[in-house]
Amino acid sequence: MHLDLIHKSFILVWLIYIRAALADQFTYKACYSASDIRKLGLTYKGVYEYQSVSYCQNECPGQAVVALFNGTGCYCGGSVAQLQSLTQVDSSKCDVSCAGWPYQNCGGSSAMNVYINNAASTADSTSSTATSTSTTSSSSTSVSSKTSTKLDTKTSTSSSATHSSSSSSTTSTTTSSSETTTSSSSSSSSSSTSTTSTTSTTSSTTSTSSSPSTTSSSTSASSSSETSSTQATSSSTTSTSSSTSTATVTSTPSSTSIGTSTHYTTRVVTQSVVSQANQQASTIFTTRTSVYATVSSTSSSTSSLLNGKSSSSKSKGLSGGAIAGVVVGVVCGTVALLALALFFFVWKKRRQSSQHVDLEETKQYQPYSLGDADANPVIPPSASSTNWHIPSRNNTALSKNTASTFATYDLPTRAPGGRDSIITGDAHNISKRSHFPSVVYEEPPSIYNGNQRFSATSLPDMMEERQLHIVNPDNVSSNIGSNVSDGDDDYDDAKDSNNSSLR
């Protein structure tokens, strides 16, 4: 018993789930006049710049009828039965492409493309199945068992009830058994009703079948058994109108077929009961019925033509809004990349300019750089001074008087006399050196016609012609004493001669 309840609950949940999955599946109906559709009192959803069939259907959840007008307008509401009183127009009047998806048509200037909700259309059909099985068993002890099962099937709900009653109060032993299986299946499809007609009208269809059977048997105890089974199945299709027109052939790109199969298993068990009172054997027939329900879902794809034109309920491609979003995203990404590249270029250029060393700013820290003026130059005295003449190493236009002036110096010469002449020249020039400033001086560029030159040596070295010589270190130590004594004597002799010349 508990297993049967579990099976019934499972079937109910599956039916509800499949009903929810089939919700809002629209199918193209036909092209109708715009004035006729407006008379049905549909709700106007407004104009959308990127209108498409799928967008309008999403704007009308749970509505039975959806209509599109002139490429941008959207209407929804009403019922499928209201369309039966309208007259279809030629599909060429619904040739305006959708604004958001030009591969579909969204009505015309004076007509509308109409789509119907499959869930709303199948909700108008109802099928019911009733099955009853009764079994009566009698014997000398008057023990009976009766089983009754009823199954009602609809598109949205399913209910099943089983009533069973039995009575037995004896110890039984199974002697024989027989099993009878009755299978009943009912299926419903989400695309149309169970009855299809092209040009005729149908009000209701009812089919009933019954199969009674009677079985009797007798035993030595004058017991009899009778089994009766009756199965009735009825299905009907109702509508608000007296007649239903099914002249159009619908196209469903994706439809789901639901099949419900119910199996009834009846088992008759023969039991032999022995009473303890009079030791008389009695035979009891017990009937057990098991109900198994199986739900199967099959997905299929069908396609048909309506007035020579192929149509589909929903588009598999991207909607207009999605395409616009992709375009905007690509443009924004490109602009961002260009801005990033420009920023990197400017940053790199500024960094290179900041790392450049300006020699004009740093040359004051390099006073001896070639071509730079001295930070603290020594101003030379005027050339008109009587006690100052700039010596020069070449004969230029600015130093034409230096030759005669420089000739007045008594430069030392190498005479055969040796050291006497050198000391005499030095003593003669000592008195004149005190009249001149320091000769450690770099000549200004103006003296050499703008060409900067530096002194290679000091003036005293030039005047005295002190040349460097290679000296043997071994001979230096031996000649130190003699040179010192000779030098002192020579100095005294030179001093005496100098004094005499001054007189």
UniProtKB/Swiss-Prot annotation:
Residues 1-23 form the signal peptide. Keywords: Cell membrane, Cell wall biogenesis/degradation, Glycoprotein, Membrane, Phosphoprotein, Signal, Transmembrane, Transmembrane helix. The modification Phosphoserine is found at S455, S458. GO terms for biological process: fungal-type cell wall organization; response to heat; Rho protein signal transduction. It is a single-pass membrane protein. The keyword Cell cycle does not apply. Residues 24-325 are extracellular. This is Cell wall integrity and stress response component 2. Residues 124-260, 470-503 are annotated as: Disordered. InterPro entries: Immunoregulatory_rcpt-like, WSC_carb-bd. GO terms for cellular component: cellular bud; cellular bud neck; cytoplasm; fungal-type vacuole; mating projection tip; plasma membrane; site of polarized growth. Its main location: membrane. The chain crosses the membrane at residues 326-346. One of its GO terms (molecular function) is transmembrane signaling receptor activity. Residues 347-503 are cytoplasmic. Pfam families: WSC. Residues 25-118 form the WSC domain. It is found in: Cell membrane. The modification Phosphothreonine is found at T402. N-glycosylated.
